[in-house]
């Protein structure tokens, strides 16, 4: 009975819509007028249409390597800090991990086709550091990793989708964590630039938009203040990790990340920019603040909040 009532309402609305449309055209209005009126109605109702954006607005989707690739030990890939972290009981809900994830490593062609059907202009994805350099500078470049990302980039371009590539999105080769503590050591700056150079050299002829590090502020917060992300370091009152100092280590980590970013940007601009003509920057995890009251003190508080979180 409920279903019949719903169908009756639906067909009644459909009939009214048809009659209304017929009445409008019988009064001499053109299809162009109707389209403009429809857009105005949609805009008033809060409906977002592509036509409301400037012609050069870029519509895109994004992922990160650990979240979607899977194949965590296939074709020469090494362990990342996330591979190790998620295999420790209690670190994730129900022991979930990215061993398979969305299986993008094997199904990237399907994923690219789906993006093409969506009509997106750009796809931002990250390269798994441990798939390119399983042991950082302490091992060889993995040719299967290079081949995989070449295939992804080439097929994106064939579908008219611009690749936006993040060099590091939370994941670090576990080898570097074990050898010198990852982002806690200045040695990682050299490793990161070495890795970035390989990315520029192998993919830069087609990739014109680079992001060095994804959200360094959140890596610091989640991994070294709260201990919720690898390497799970923290101290009271923020958490009860087995090791870490939530007051000092985040500053060291951000310092090393910013210098790694700066050195990679310098390398790109010096050695690759003239030939490849790309752009390079960093992604910061945003927080938005509103003044509590409409007065100078509240606006100053907003400024302080932005300065504290973003520098």
Identify what each model region corresponds to.
Residues 107-128, 162:
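Catalytic domains of carbohydrate-active enzymes, especially glycoside hydrolases
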Residues 50, 97, 101-104, 108, ...:
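Aromatic-acidic/polar surface patches that form glycan- and anion
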Residues 78-113:
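Aromatic- and Gly/Pro-rich amphipathic surface segment
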């Amino acid at each position: 009975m409920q279903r019949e009532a719903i169908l009756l309402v639906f067909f009644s609305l459909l009939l009214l819509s048809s009659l209304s449309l017929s009445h409008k055209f019988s009064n001499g209005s053109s299809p162009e007028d109707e389209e403009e009126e429809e857009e105005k109605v949609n805009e008033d109702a809060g409906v977002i249409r592509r036509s409301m954006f400037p012609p050069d607005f870029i519509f895109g989707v994004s992922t990160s390597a650990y979240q979607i690739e899977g194949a965590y030990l296939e074709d020469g890939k090494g362990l990342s800090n996330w591979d190790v972290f998620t295999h420790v009981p209690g670190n994730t809900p129900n022991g979930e991990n990215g061993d398979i994830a969305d299986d993008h490593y094997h199904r990237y062609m399907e994923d690219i086709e789906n993006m093409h059907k969506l009509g997106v202009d750009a796809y931002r994805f990250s390269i798994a550091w441990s798939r390119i350099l399983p042991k950082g500078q302490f091992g060889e470049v993995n040719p299967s990793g290079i081949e995989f990302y070449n295939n992804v980039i080439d097929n994106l371009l064939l579908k008219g989708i611009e690749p936006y590539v993040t060099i590091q999105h939370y994941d670090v080769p576990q080898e570097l964590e074990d050898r010198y503590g990852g982002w806690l050591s200045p040695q990682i700056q050299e490793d990161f630039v070495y890795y970035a150079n390989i990315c520029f050299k192998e993919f830069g002829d087609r990739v014109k938009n680079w992001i060095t590090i994804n959200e360094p502020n959140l890596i610091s917060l989640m991994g070294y203040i709260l201990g919720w992300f690898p390497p799970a370091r923290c101290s009271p009152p923020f958490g009860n990790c087995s090791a870490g100092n939530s007051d000092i280590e985040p500053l060291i980590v951000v310092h090393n990340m910013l210098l790694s970013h700066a050195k990679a940007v310098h390398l790109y601009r010096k050695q690759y920019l003239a030939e490849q003509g790309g752009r390079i920057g960093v992604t910061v995890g945003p927080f938005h603040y509103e003044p509590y009251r409409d007065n100078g003190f509240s606006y100053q508080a907003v400024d302080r909040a932005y300065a504290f979180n973003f520098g």
